[in-house]
Design a protein with these regions (language model features):
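Short, low-complexity N-terminal intrinsically disordered segments enriched in polar/charged residues
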Residues: 1-28, 131-146
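Hydrophobic pocket/interface hotspot
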Residues: 13, 25-26, 33, 44, ...
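A solvent-exposed, acidic/Ser-Thr-rich amphipathic alpha-helical stretch
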Residues: 22-27, 31-75
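Short beta-strand segments enriched in hydrophobic/aromatic residues
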Residues: 29, 82-86, 99, 115
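Hydrophobic/aromatic beta-strand elements that line small-molecule binding cavities or substrate pockets
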Residues: 52, 66-71, 84, 96-102
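Short, cysteine-centered beta-strand-loop-beta hairpins and adjacent loop/turn segments enriched
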Residues: 58-61, 85-94
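A short hydrophobic beta-strand element
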Residues: 74-84
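Short beta-strand edge/turn micro-motifs at domain boundaries
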Residues: 96-128, 132
Length: 146
């Protein structure tokens, strides 16, 4: 697959994801694909499908938005810098995400994603106990930084 074809496939994947089109979103993955992200490790199309169902259910308005360097591709590998934006239980969030895509043939074979769950927790913490817990963790991690 050429660099241009990989970028095109990633953009089509983003569009399907943003439309919450489960079957179309899943169609970009090889049968034995794997995806590692802060929510877990998902091996095979069935586990990836269950992950998408869960994401679409708890984050019905989550969108992938281009950010920063966007997509940098080389042969069968690409890195994508983007923002995940949505809401959870009525509270809005926006977090930076980085994904590494590796293709095999015309499908995604390996996907590794990272995003800051603590930043998301800070934006979504509800009530004094949750806010205190999240801020305590953040303050401990940033001790001596400022």
């Amino acid at each position: 697959m050429s660099k241009e074809e990989l970028i095109s496939m990633m953009r089509k994947f983003k569009d399907a994801f943003n439309k919450k089109d489960l079957e179309k979103t899943l169609s970009f993955f090889a049968e034995d694909a794997d995806w590692v992200n802060p929510n877990g490790k998902f091996k095979g199309k069935e586990e990836i499908k269950n992950y998408f169902k869960w994401v679409f259910e708890i984050n019905p308005d989550q969108k992938i938005i281009d950010s920063g360097v966007k997509i940098i591709a080389e042969e069968d590998k690409a890195v994508y810098e983007h923002i995940l934006e949505g809401s959870f239980e009525g509270m809005k969030y926006q977090i930076l995400a980085l994904c590494i895509y590796e293709s095999k043939g015309s499908k995604f074979q390996h996907l590794r994603s990272t995003f800051d769950r603590l930043s998301m927790a800070k934006q979504l913490a509800k009530g004094p106990i949750a806010k205190t817990a999240v801020n305590t963790i953040i303050n401990r991690m940033e001790k001596g930084l400022k």
